[in-house]
Swiss-Prot record:
Gene behind this protein: fmt
An example Gene Ontology molecular-function term: methionyl-tRNA formyltransferase activity
Enzyme class: transferase
Residues bound to (6S)-5,6,7,8-tetrahydrofolate: S109, L110, L111, P112
Protein name according to UniProt: Methionyl-tRNA formyltransferase
Short name of any one Pfam family annotated for the protein: Formyl_trans_N
Length: 309
């Protein structure tokens, strides 16, 4: 099958490789090169780097909907499918109508739940027990197209967004291959998205600031959901303290929320609006992430200090 692939970050690369192995990828569309690092040198997207290894033509529209030259090129290619994995741009009807079998999107949630830009984060922040990938036939809406195939994964109580990302990143490629095969054979029938939904909006930095009046369970989910980025944080004696790993102690205490009630090598116990949060791994300014056992070897964390003040 002739395929045009549209994708940008690491998440899209394994799917791209699978398509190269099984089909004829005629072109790649990815986001423009962006300044990176202290030197602000232009850096290629992970998908562009991969495409160049295979000498596949790469196009980088700032806004595809306004780029008539690239749209005409897509029409010349006349692909059977356009496959989209975390491309980062909305496709117009003109582009959606180009491929013979349609545009397929791999979305990292069990649609219709968690449409939007940050499904991996929000599914964990909300404390869900399962997630997965969904393939869908794209329409002009945002993640609203007819569903094709789904694949579920369990979310264990300590799983981070980074860990879920890596699982779904690898499994997504196989799901795309099955979807292409099923559409070509007629064995897959598109299903309308109906029922409850939740929009997984882009993350903002304010979300990362911990509110200790909340239940420790919800704070734990926030910590997991914001790891590896942007990382949930609080303040200890005026210094920013980032939380990388926590667990919940289901125990009622009378201390003011945010109060450190115990410190040992297993962790820092903090009173919350409900239950107790045990902080197991932290990072302070100019330091690297350390377990509490590592950190208290050379530094002190004092009992009775109130975090966030």
């Amino acid at each position: 099958m002739k395929i045009v692939f549209m994708g940008t970050p690491d998440f899209a690369v394994p799917s791209f490789r699978k398509l190269i192995e099984e089909h004829e990828v005629k072109a790649v569309l990815t986001q423009p090169d962006k300044p990176k690092g202290r030197g602000k040198k232009l850096a290629y997207s992970p998908v562009k780097e991969e495409a160049l290894k295979y000498d596949i033509p790469v196009y980088q529209p700032t806004k595809l909907k306004d780029d008539k030259e690239i749209i005409e090129k897509l029409k010349e290619i006349n692909p059977d499918f356009i496959i989209v994995v975390a491309f980062g741009q909305i496709l117009t009807k003109e582009v959606l109508d180009i491929p013979k079998y349609g545009c397929i999107n791999l979305h990292a949630s069990l649609l219709p739940m968690y449409r939007g830009a940050a499904p991996l984060n929000w599914v964990i922040i909300k404390g869900e027990k399962k997630s997965g990938n969904t393939t869908m036939l794209m329409d002009v809406g945002l993640d609203t197209g007819d569903m094709l195939l789904k694949e579920e994964v369990e979310i264990h109580e300590d799983m981070t967004t980074g860990e879920l990302h890596d699982i779904l990143m690898i499994s997504g490629g196989e799901l795309l291959l099955k979807t292409i095969e099923g559409l070509c054979s007629g064995s897959i029938k598109p299903v309308k998205q109906e029922g409850e939904t939740f929009y997984a909006k882009m993350l903002d930095k304010e979300l990362a600031h911990i509110n200790w009046t909340e239940d420790a369970y919800d704070i734990h989910n926030l910590v997991r959901g914001l790891n590896p980025w942007p990382i949930a944080y609080t303040e200890y004696k005026g210094e920013r303290m980032k939380l990388y790993k926590t667990k919940v102690l289901y125990k009622e205490v009378s201390n003011k929320p945010g109060t450190i009630i115990e410190v040992n090598k297993e962790g820092v116990k903090v009173a919350c609006g409900k239950n107790v949060l045990i902080i197991e791994k932290v990072q302070f300014p100019n330091g690297k992430p350390l377990t509490i056992e590592q950190y208290i070897n050379g530094h002190s964390i004092e009992k009775d200090i109130i975090l966030g003040e």
